[in-house]
From Swiss-Prot:
<dbReference type="InterPro" id="IPR044666">
    <property type="entry name" value="Cyclophilin_A-like"/>
</dbReference>
<keyword id="KW-0413">Isomerase</keyword>
<dbReference type="InterPro" id="IPR002130">
    <property type="entry name" value="Cyclophilin-type_PPIase_dom"/>
</dbReference>
<dbReference type="GO" id="GO:0006457">
    <property type="term" value="P:protein folding"/>
</dbReference>
<dbReference type="Pfam" id="PF00160">
    <property type="entry name" value="Pro_isomerase"/>
</dbReference>
<keyword id="KW-0697">Rotamase</keyword>
<dbReference type="GO" id="GO:0071013">
    <property type="term" value="C:catalytic step 2 spliceosome"/>
</dbReference>
<dbReference type="GO" id="GO:0003755">
    <property type="term" value="F:peptidyl-prolyl cis-trans isomerase activity"/>
</dbReference>
<dbReference type="InterPro" id="IPR029000">
    <property type="entry name" value="Cyclophilin-like_dom_sf"/>
</dbReference>
<dbReference type="InterPro" id="IPR020892">
    <property type="entry name" value="Cyclophilin-type_PPIase_CS"/>
</dbReference>
<feature type="domain" description="PPIase cyclophilin-type">
    <location>
        <begin position="1"/>
        <end position="160"/>
    </location>
</feature>
<comment type="similarity">
    <text>Belongs to the cyclophilin-type PPIase family. PPIL3 subfamily.</text>
</comment>
<comment type="function">
    <text>PPIases accelerate the folding of proteins. It catalyzes the cis-trans isomerization of proline imidic peptide bonds in oligopeptides.</text>
</comment>
<protein>
    <recommendedName>
        <fullName>Peptidyl-prolyl cis-trans isomerase-like 3</fullName>
        <ecNumber>5.2.1.8</ecNumber>
    </recommendedName>
</protein>
<dbReference type="InterPro" id="IPR024936">
    <property type="entry name" value="Cyclophilin-type_PPIase"/>
</dbReference>
Length: 167
Protein backbone atom coordinates (compact mmCIF):
# COMPACT_ATOMS: atom_id res chain seq x y z
CA UNK A 1 0.00 0.00 0.00
CA UNK A 2 1.34 3.40 -0.93
CA UNK A 3 0.37 6.99 -1.59
CA UNK A 4 2.01 9.72 -3.63
CA UNK A 5 2.05 13.25 -2.29
CA UNK A 6 2.22 15.49 -5.35
CA UNK A 7 3.96 18.60 -4.01
CA UNK A 8 4.99 21.89 -5.57
CA UNK A 9 8.60 20.58 -5.48
CA UNK A 10 7.97 17.08 -6.84
CA UNK A 11 6.47 13.76 -5.79
CA UNK A 12 6.91 11.93 -2.49
CA UNK A 13 5.80 8.29 -2.67
CA UNK A 14 5.18 6.73 0.74
CA UNK A 15 4.89 3.04 1.55
CA UNK A 16 2.32 2.72 4.37
CA UNK A 17 2.78 0.07 7.08
CA UNK A 18 -0.92 -0.92 7.17
CA UNK A 19 -0.53 -4.23 9.00
CA UNK A 20 1.79 -2.91 11.72
CA UNK A 21 -0.11 0.28 12.57
CA UNK A 22 -3.68 -0.24 11.28
CA UNK A 23 -5.38 2.66 13.08
CA UNK A 24 -2.71 5.17 12.03
CA UNK A 25 -2.76 3.81 8.47
CA UNK A 26 -6.56 4.06 8.31
CA UNK A 27 -6.44 7.67 9.54
CA UNK A 28 -3.75 8.70 7.06
CA UNK A 29 -5.30 6.89 4.09
CA UNK A 30 -8.79 8.24 4.82
CA UNK A 31 -7.45 11.79 5.06
CA UNK A 32 -5.52 11.27 1.80
CA UNK A 33 -8.55 9.83 -0.02
CA UNK A 34 -10.85 12.63 1.18
CA UNK A 35 -8.62 15.41 -0.17
CA UNK A 36 -7.88 16.64 3.37
CA UNK A 37 -4.18 17.14 2.60
CA UNK A 38 -4.76 18.97 -0.70
CA UNK A 39 -3.05 22.40 -0.48
CA UNK A 40 -1.54 21.55 2.93
CA UNK A 41 1.65 23.54 3.50
CA UNK A 42 4.98 22.16 4.62
CA UNK A 43 4.98 24.48 7.62
CA UNK A 44 8.04 23.41 9.62
CA UNK A 45 11.49 22.27 8.60
CA UNK A 46 14.58 21.62 10.67
CA UNK A 47 17.59 20.92 8.41
CA UNK A 48 19.32 17.58 9.10
CA UNK A 49 16.25 16.50 11.11
CA UNK A 50 12.78 16.64 9.50
CA UNK A 51 10.07 18.43 7.51
CA UNK A 52 6.47 18.62 8.78
CA UNK A 53 3.09 18.96 7.06
CA UNK A 54 -0.50 17.75 7.41
CA UNK A 55 -2.27 20.75 8.90
CA UNK A 56 -5.38 21.78 6.99
CA UNK A 57 -4.85 24.41 4.31
CA UNK A 58 -7.96 26.33 5.39
CA UNK A 59 -8.61 25.79 9.09
CA UNK A 60 -12.17 26.43 10.24
CA UNK A 61 -12.61 25.53 13.91
CA UNK A 62 -14.05 23.49 15.48
CA UNK A 63 -14.51 20.94 12.66
CA UNK A 64 -11.13 21.67 11.09
CA UNK A 65 -8.86 23.24 13.73
CA UNK A 66 -5.59 24.96 12.81
CA UNK A 67 -3.44 22.03 13.93
CA UNK A 68 -5.62 19.43 12.22
CA UNK A 69 -7.64 16.49 13.48
CA UNK A 70 -7.95 12.77 12.94
CA UNK A 71 -10.84 10.82 11.43
CA UNK A 72 -11.57 9.52 14.95
CA UNK A 73 -12.10 12.96 16.51
CA UNK A 74 -9.52 15.52 17.58
CA UNK A 75 -6.80 12.94 18.36
CA UNK A 76 -6.15 9.22 18.63
CA UNK A 77 -3.76 6.94 20.50
CA UNK A 78 -0.20 6.04 19.58
CA UNK A 79 0.69 2.76 17.88
CA UNK A 80 4.30 2.49 18.97
CA UNK A 81 5.96 -0.65 17.58
CA UNK A 82 9.55 -1.47 18.63
CA UNK A 83 10.31 -2.83 15.13
CA UNK A 84 9.29 0.48 13.50
CA UNK A 85 12.04 2.94 14.30
CA UNK A 86 13.21 6.40 13.35
CA UNK A 87 16.37 4.84 11.95
CA UNK A 88 16.85 6.26 8.44
CA UNK A 89 16.24 9.09 6.01
CA UNK A 90 12.71 9.03 4.60
CA UNK A 91 10.88 7.56 7.61
CA UNK A 92 7.35 9.00 7.94
CA UNK A 93 5.95 9.46 11.44
CA UNK A 94 3.02 11.13 13.18
CA UNK A 95 3.62 14.54 14.73
CA UNK A 96 2.09 14.94 18.18
CA UNK A 97 1.98 17.08 21.32
CA UNK A 98 2.67 14.20 23.70
CA UNK A 99 1.36 10.67 24.26
CA UNK A 100 -1.81 9.73 22.38
CA UNK A 101 -2.29 13.11 20.64
CA UNK A 102 -2.05 12.09 16.97
CA UNK A 103 -4.20 14.07 14.55
CA UNK A 104 -3.42 14.76 10.90
CA UNK A 105 0.11 16.17 11.00
CA UNK A 106 3.12 14.07 10.11
CA UNK A 107 6.80 14.50 9.37
CA UNK A 108 9.46 12.97 7.14
CA UNK A 109 12.98 12.44 8.48
CA UNK A 110 16.10 13.79 6.80
CA UNK A 111 18.26 11.55 9.00
CA UNK A 112 17.85 8.95 11.74
CA UNK A 113 16.33 10.27 14.98
CA UNK A 114 16.44 7.50 17.61
CA UNK A 115 15.37 9.94 20.35
CA UNK A 116 11.85 9.77 18.81
CA UNK A 117 11.55 5.97 19.17
CA UNK A 118 8.77 5.23 21.65
CA UNK A 119 7.40 8.78 21.35
CA UNK A 120 6.06 9.08 17.79
CA UNK A 121 4.23 6.50 15.66
CA UNK A 122 6.20 5.47 12.57
CA UNK A 123 3.73 4.58 9.82
CA UNK A 124 5.64 4.65 6.55
CA UNK A 125 8.75 5.41 4.55
CA UNK A 126 9.61 7.12 1.29
CA UNK A 127 10.23 4.83 -1.68
CA UNK A 128 11.91 5.51 -5.00
CA UNK A 129 14.66 7.82 -6.23
CA UNK A 130 12.26 10.62 -7.19
CA UNK A 131 10.97 10.76 -3.61
CA UNK A 132 14.48 11.04 -2.22
CA UNK A 133 15.31 13.77 -4.74
CA UNK A 134 12.22 15.73 -3.71
CA UNK A 135 13.16 15.27 -0.05
CA UNK A 136 16.64 16.65 -0.83
CA UNK A 137 15.02 19.71 -2.47
CA UNK A 138 12.91 20.26 0.64
CA UNK A 139 15.93 19.99 2.91
CA UNK A 140 17.81 22.52 0.79
CA UNK A 141 15.23 25.28 1.27
CA UNK A 142 15.88 28.28 3.50
CA UNK A 143 14.02 28.62 6.80
CA UNK A 144 13.44 31.55 9.13
CA UNK A 145 14.30 31.66 12.84
CA UNK A 146 11.08 29.78 13.65
CA UNK A 147 11.92 26.92 11.23
CA UNK A 148 9.29 28.03 8.72
CA UNK A 149 10.21 27.48 5.09
CA UNK A 150 10.65 30.88 3.40
CA UNK A 151 9.34 29.59 0.05
CA UNK A 152 5.76 28.29 0.00
CA UNK A 153 5.72 24.52 -0.52
CA UNK A 154 2.44 22.61 -0.50
CA UNK A 155 0.92 19.21 -1.11
CA UNK A 156 -1.09 19.85 -4.28
CA UNK A 157 -2.97 16.54 -4.22
CA UNK A 158 -2.56 12.92 -3.14
CA UNK A 159 -2.87 9.71 -5.14
CA UNK A 160 -3.80 6.61 -3.13
CA UNK A 161 -2.51 3.43 -4.80
CA UNK A 162 -4.65 0.30 -4.18
CA UNK A 163 -6.24 1.35 -0.91
CA UNK A 164 -7.05 -1.89 1.00
CA UNK A 165 -9.24 0.09 3.39
CA UNK A 166 -11.54 1.46 0.68
CA UNK A 167 -15.15 0.41 1.15
Amino acid sequence: MSVTLHTTLGDLKIEIFCESVPKTAENFLALCASGYYNASPFHRMIPSFMVQTGAPANPSPPENPKGGRSIYGPTFEDEIRPVLRHNERGIVSMANKGPNTNGSQFFILFDKAPHLDGLNTVFGKLIGDESLQTLAKLEGLEVDKKNRIKEEVRIERVTVHANPLAK
